[in-house]
């Protein structure tokens, strides 16, 4: 496979409902994006009754192979940036310790191995939070280990961890300027 002329955004969705709809809206605003949908994200799409109405140039990869075959594209320069968000505490923990057993954690690992910068929108970032569940807003209380893993992820090379939707928007804008 030859190196591509115009690298794309990669965006991995996990099984979190935290700002899920807003993340999908941001995906729709990007040019040339590939969406990696984990099995858990597919469940959340159904629970939140979300359709993937995205630009025609968007390619969708689902978590259907044991080896997460789509990750091979990272080796050939297909992606300039990976966005992982919303990222569950489970996904963040796996990223911190190097476990890559889902489509999301596999693309994160391959992005790191190929020095593709990653932006991670972590869900569990404060001791007390409000988040949207399928039937409305709920309070959640992330565990200390979840908060510690989010902090540890900030020390991973080529990774920017954002904790709010506003920070995600800023990180995306900054990356667009870097690529221009």
Where are these regions (language model features)?
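A cross-family phosphate/adenosyl-ligand binding-site feature
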Residues: 1-180
């Amino acid at each position: 496979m030859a190196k591509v002329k115009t690298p794309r955004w990669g965006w991995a969705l996990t099984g979190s409902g935290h700002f899920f709809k807003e993340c999908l809206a941001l995906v729709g605003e990007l040019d040339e994006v590939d969406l990696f949908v984990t099995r858990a994200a597919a469940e959340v799409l159904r629970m939140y009754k979300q359709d993937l109405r995205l630009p025609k140039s968007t390619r969708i990869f689902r978590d259907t192979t044991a080896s997460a075959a789509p990750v091979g594209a990272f080796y050939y320069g297909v992606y300039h940036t990976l966005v992982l968000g919303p990222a569950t505490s489970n996904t963040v923990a796996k990223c911190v310790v190097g476990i890559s057993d889902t489509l999301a954690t596999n693309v994160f690992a391959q992005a790191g191995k190929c020095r593709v910068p990653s932006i991670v929108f972590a869900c569990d970032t404060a001791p007390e939070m409000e988040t949207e569940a399928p039937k409305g807003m709920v309070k959640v209380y992330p565990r200390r280990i979840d908060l510690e893993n989010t902090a540890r992820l900030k020390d991973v090379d080529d990774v920017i961890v954002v904790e709010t939707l506003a920070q995600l928007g800023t990180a995306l804008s900054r990356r667009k300027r870097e690529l221009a």
